[in-house]
Structures are given as C-alpha cells and as structure tokens.
Amino acid sequence: MTKTVEERERVVVRFAGDSGDGMQLAGSRFTDATAMMGNDLATLPNFPAEIRAPAGTLAGVSAFQIHFASRDILTPGDKPNVLVAMNPAALKANLPELDRGTTLILNEDAFNKRNLEKAGYAANPLEDGSLSAYRVHRIPMTSLTVRAVEGIEGASTRDAGRAKNLFALGVLSWLYGRPTDGTKKWIEKKFAGKPAVLLANLAAFNAGWSFGETTELLDVQYRVKPATDVPPGTYRNVNGTTALSLGLIAASVRSGLGLLLASYPITPASELLHELSRHASLGVKTIQAEDEIAAAGMALGAAFGGRLGVTATSGPGMDLKAETIGLAAALELPMIVVDVQRAGPSTGMPTKTEQSDLLMAVHGRHGESPLPVIAPSTPGGCFAAAFEAAQIAIRYRTPVILLSDSFLASSSEPWRVPVVGDLPSIDPAFAVAHDGEEFMPYARDELLARPWAIPGTPGLAHRIGGLEKADGTGNISYDGANHERMTELRAAKVDGIARDIPPLHVDAEPGARLLVLGWGSSEGTIRAGVRRAREAGHTVACAHLHHLNPFPVNTGQLAQLLRAKFLVDVESFCKVQGQPLFASEIEQQIAERQ
C-alpha cells in the first residue's frame, strides 16, 4: 500500500517497558542508527536501581528517551512525541508527562487482567476511552513476534517472547526511516554464539519493519533530514562514560604516563571501570579494589610511582575517599578523582541523577585542603574535561576532582573524534638529581608546584606521609609558622590554576538584567530554556561554569558559593527529583523574574 511521507524537524521518542524487556538495548540501537543518519541527537536512559524489579509494576519500568533533529539540539527533550509502551505499567508510569495528541504505540498483548491489576488499572485503558486524547496504535507485538519466530530450530517460546523489543525496534525503524543494515549486523555480532537466538531476533526485527510497511494502522512514515550545521570531521555516538575514558587514555598517551584506574564497584561509576578495562592493549591498568578507601590509596600509590593515577566513585564513595584525597593534597601528587554524582544522601536513588556533591568536592576535607574541581556539561565534553583534569593534575602536582553525574554518564550525543596527535602534549617533568645538590622535595617552581620524584631514582630519596612538611626540605614539621606558610602555598597554587582557565563566555543580549548561570549537565537545558524565553520576547543572558574551583571568575550549593565569594544576589532554582532539569522549567523561571 502507498503511504504518506511527512517531514519533521525534530522528534522525541521514548521506549518504555519492564526492566527485563530490553528497552535500553532497543533505545541504544535506535540511537546508533539515528547517528548513522546524520541527525543531531541527545538521549536519556532511565531505569530502576534493582537488577530486576518486579515485572509488570510501576517500580519496574525502564525507559530510554531519544531526541533527534535536523538541526542543533541541546537536550533529550522535556517529554516524548511518541511513547512505545510494552505493558500497562509502562503506559501508566509515563502517561502523566504526555501532552494531548502524543502518539502511543502499545503492545496490545500485554494488556491482560493480570498485568492491568499489577499496574493498578481498574479497567483496561485500551477499551474505556481514557486514551481518547492520544493517537493510539494497538499492536499485538508479543504474538506477532512469536509468529515470526515459529519454525526457527532451537528457538524456544521464551526466546520468541524476549525478542519483542526487536519487533518494536523494527516498527520504529520503519516509522522514521532508520537504516536497517547496521542493526542486522549488530544482531549477528551480538548473538553470534547463539544461532537460534540470533535468527529469532533477526526475524523479530524484520517482522517489525514489515509490519510497519504493510499495516493500515500506520499510514504515515516520517522523515527527519540529517543535520546540516555540523562541522566537518569524523563522528561517533558517545556517552559520557566512554568519552571520559577516552579522554583519560588520550592524556596518558600525550603525557607518556601509564594509566591506572582503581575503583570499587558503585552505581553509576562502575561503567568507567568496565570501559577502561577494555583498553588493556593501550597500556591501561584497571583494578577492582576491595573497598573505596583501598581504591583511592591505589590511585595515589600509582601517582607516587609515576603513573596517571585515577579513582572513580559516586557520592557515598566520596565520603570514604575523603581522607585519602586529603593525603594526596598534602603530598601534592597528581591524581584524578571522578565523582559520577547520583541522588542522595546515603544510598539514595542509585540510578537517578543529581548535582548535589558540589560543596563536598570543594570543601569536603578536614583542614585547609583546596583542590581544583572541574565539571563537564555534555557527554562529549567529558573527553575534554578528563584531558584537562590530567593536564592540571600533572602541571600543578595536585589531585583534581571531576564532577560528572548519572545523566551525563549514560546519555549520548554525536561527538567529533579528535586527532590525538593534535592534542597538546603534557610534560610530566619528572625530577632529576643534580650532582652535589641536596634534593629539595618541596621546593617550588613558578607555578608553586613541587618536584615529582619517581621512587628508586638515585639521589631523589625523600620522606612522604600525612604529617606536615617543612617548606623546601619536606622534613616533618610541627612549627606553626611553617604550617601557615605551607597552607598558604598550597592554596595559592590552586588559586593560580585560574591563569590557565579561559574567560567565562557569557551569551548576552543588550539590556539583559537577568543572567541564568549553571554548572555541569544543566547547560543544554539552560541554553534551550533561554532560547525559548528569547523567542517569547524576554531579554536574558546565560553563562555556564565548567571550573568550580578556582572560578574563572545546585541545588542551592552553587548559589552559596557565589554569594560567599562575590556578595551578589543569587536566586537559586533547584530540582531534586532524580531527573534532569527541563527547558520548559527554565523558561518558566525566566518569565517569572522578568
């Protein structure tokens, strides 16, 4: 049958189902196909903390949202235009967010009495008229998948049922004209060791595509043209974890230092350990430590031994690492601490995002121990942030804290791959012995950085430890005047990093008296909200901080720091729901202050 093709500038699609329905997989694969089409995109995975939450319940709903467009986009979208719901719970959990007219693609087979009761429905929403405000497409995905898999030798009924996410992916791939060859090759590679499962998933995907092509339910196919305002280069789809890993590896290559990551598993930082462990061929060493304190100690030991020492964690782990980070500040050794923030306090909501560790990163150590703090704002920007963290750590002989978050770590975007040889070199400038001269381990260069002496180097033996050091010699000292001088030197060294920080860019309009200022992963949302506010006639400026200590100068933490340092009036807008900010929320806050 002949179908109408309509063009769209942008679309937001959300896949939702049980945590065992493969929604993250389907969404990720749709994202890769979209990247190959040349669209700009941003994604937002959202899943429960449990490995397998109770099937069919609201608590067990897993979702993956992708916003793709023919122009530059800044966020994963506030709410979807299309919801793919694999069961009643997925529909009910997401329905409150949807606008009237949203397209619903529903797995009709799952709307049985048992699943409806689990989701808290007294009546079937497919039959009671409650969805009349939406464009509803009822598709028996499970039964059509089972039928497509029939006859495949070795494929069980369970294999057929589990492949329904690939059926849904096939339908959406047809609906938006996504290429299929890449997905088919991906299926063949992923299930190469299980021939029956491979054939079942291929059959399900092909059946979904064919259903879209032939059914009268879907009479329109949509086309989103490739983005045209993209600088030339080689691009890949990348999430924040992968970009951060590649940034650390690039810093290792450009400095000539071996990279060691020591971490204790903790959501959502564990993915960094998993990703870097895949790159042993590049000289990367990874250690899964027995606890957070041991992991920090291993990273610091690696730095003492002349490597690029890195440890990664999330909020609760930062509490445990604090003493070792303070030791690193006293030893003045280059070390990188990655904090992938999550909703807290305590265990909190491990898979939900939050920017709530700012004050801990800046001030969360006993004594006077200031450290540089960097926060990337986009998944691709995690590469540059990791590389810069290594530059600062090595150049200034200091631990550096890099604040990512769960949203940044798991969301993705097209990223232009840099040429490693074009990146600046990083000189470790290891200390060397000079005949007839006493080695002074706490002498200072023009940056106030001390020498980095590799253990075992003749003539460079020196004392380390947490006790205060005498200026220059590094001997243990309890002298009050010396302690004051060393405290001032360490602080001045960190303050001096500001000379390497570029001026803060302010996106201003003439006459603007309102500045929207943020940090971390809120940048895209802020820029999108400001864009909308300007289109509505408001005059507003925006700026974003990537360096939180020292300033190039969220919760209310950023406001506290700004008030304390600059004595300016700051109005804080905070959201503590485990989800990123929405552009519409920023737009509303601007309108209320005009």
What are these regions (language model features)?
Residues 230, 237-247, 255, 385, ...:
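Flexible, low-complexity linker and terminal segments
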Residues 135-180, 184-212, 381-394, 403-469:
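Internal gly/pro-rich beta-alpha loop/helix module
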Residues 47-48, 187, 204, 225-229, ...:
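A glycine-rich phosphate-binding loop feature that marks nucleotide/adenosyl-phosphate handling sites
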Residues 19, 141-144, 150-155, 169-173, ...:
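Peripheral docking tails and interdomain loops at the edges
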Residues 10, 147-149, 218-233, 251-258, ...:
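Gly-rich Lys/Arg/Thr-decorated short loops/hinges at beta-loop-alpha junctions or inter-strand turns
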Residues 10-99, 246, 259-260, 267-363, ...:
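Thiamine diphosphate
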Residues 1-255:
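Active-site cofactor/cluster-binding pocket
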